[in-house]
Amino acid sequence: MKFSFLTVASFLIGQVALAALSAKKFASASDLQFTIDGKTGYFAGSNSYWIGFLTNNADVDLVFDHMKESGLKILRVWGFNDVNTVPGQGTVYYQVHANGKSTINTGADGLQRLDYVVHSAEKRGIKLIINFVNNWDDYGGMNAYVKAYGETDHNAFYSNKNIQNAYRRYVKAVVSRYTNSPAVFAWELANEPRCKGCDTEVLYEWIKSTSEYIKKLDKRHMVCIGDEGFGLDLLSDGSYPYTYVEGSNFTRNLAIPTIDFGTFHLYPDSWGTTHEWGNGWAQSHGAACKAAGKPCLFEEYGVTSNHCALETPWQKTSLNTTGVSGDLYWQYGDTLSTGQSPNDGNTIYYGTDEFKCIVKDHVAAIKAKQGWV
C-alpha cells in the first residue's frame, strides 16, 4: 500500500498527540510540583487503610463520590494485607505466609477487592498511592514475612534473600495488575519503613534496589518510599525525629534517581514533640526537597483530639512552603453500609464540622492560592 507524505505526516502528528494525551492521564512530578490531569500545583488528599478490605462495592463508590465532591484528589491505601494463617470465610486477605512460602490471593476475597478500588477511583478521577508492606504488625506487616521465613528480628526483612524474593513477587503481582491505570498516583515501597539501630546504608540500599526494580516493571507511574522523614540535618533542632536512630537518612534516600518525590509524616504526640514543632518539621522537609529538586508530599499527619485547632496550622504551613506540593491527613472517615468506618481517634468523618475545617476550607484555600476557583 502506498502512502503520501501528507498521509504519513498526519499519522505521525496524530500519534504524537495521542501519546501526549495519554501522558496527561498519569500523575507526574516536575521540579517541585505534582501534575494531575494536566493541572500542576498543590493537591489535598487523605489516607484510608481499610478501603481495600471492604466487601461492598457501593461502600467503595460512596467514599470516592464524597472525595470527588469535596475536592480531595489523592487517597493513600494499603495494597497489602498479609496473614500467617488463612482467615475465616468472608475476611479479605491478599497474601498468606507460612513455612517459608508466600501465596498471593487473587480471588474474590483477595486482590479482586483492590481491583475494585482502582476501578472506582479511576471512574471518579481520584489518584491512589498504593503501598506494598507495613513496617508495623497491623495487617501482617514485615513481621509476617519474618515469622514465616524462620527469622526473629524485624530487620531481617531487608536482608533475608527469601523474604525479599517473596516481597518482590508480590510487588510484581500488584504492579502488573494496574500498570496501565491512570488511577495510580504512585507505588510506595512500605508504610513507615524503619531499621532501628541499623546503619543508614541498609535502608538506602533496599530503597535503591527496590525502586529500581519497580521502575523496570512500570515506567509510567511514580515511585515513593512512604517514610516518616526521619534522619534530616537540614534545619535540625536535634530532636528524635531528625536523628538517624531509625536507620533512615532522608536527604540521601531522596536523592535516589528512581525515587520521584519525598514523603514525610507528623505525629507530635507519639514523637514527644509539641504541636507547634510540626510547622518547622514541614518547612525543613520542604527545604530538603527544594535542594533535591523534587516535590515533597506531607503524607500523614494527625492528632486524636482538637483536630481543627491543631491540624489546620500544619496545613497552612505546608501549603505555603516551597518544596511541599500536597498533604494527606490521617485519616478519612465515612458512614458505610455497616456503620462508621474505623476510628483510631485521628479519623475525620465526612459531613462533620471537623471535615469542613480540615477538608473543605483547606481545599478552598488551595484553589484560591493557585487561581483554581
From Swiss-Prot:
Glycans are attached at residues 249, 320. Keywords: Carbohydrate metabolism, Glycoprotein, Glycosidase, Hydrolase, Secreted, Signal. Residues 1-19 form the signal peptide. GO terms for biological process: mannan catabolic process. It catalyses: Random hydrolysis of (1->4)-beta-D-mannosidic linkages in mannans, galactomannans and glucomannans. It is found in: Secreted. Substrate binds at residues 78, 155, 191, 267, 330. Its EC number is 3.2.1.78. One of its GO terms (cellular component) is extracellular region. Gene3D superfamilies: Glycosidases. It is an enzyme of class 3 (hydrolase). InterPro entries: Glyco_hydro_5, Glycoside_hydrolase_SF, MAN-like. One of its GO terms (molecular function) is mannan endo-1,4-beta-mannosidase activity. The active site is at 192 (proton donor), 300 (nucleophile). Belongs to the glycosyl hydrolase 5 (cellulase A) family. PANTHER family: MANNAN ENDO-1,4-BETA-MANNOSIDASE 1, PTHR31451. Endo-1,4-mannanase, a crucial enzyme for depolymerization of seed galactomannans and wood galactoglucomannans. This is Probable mannan endo-1,4-beta-mannosidase A.
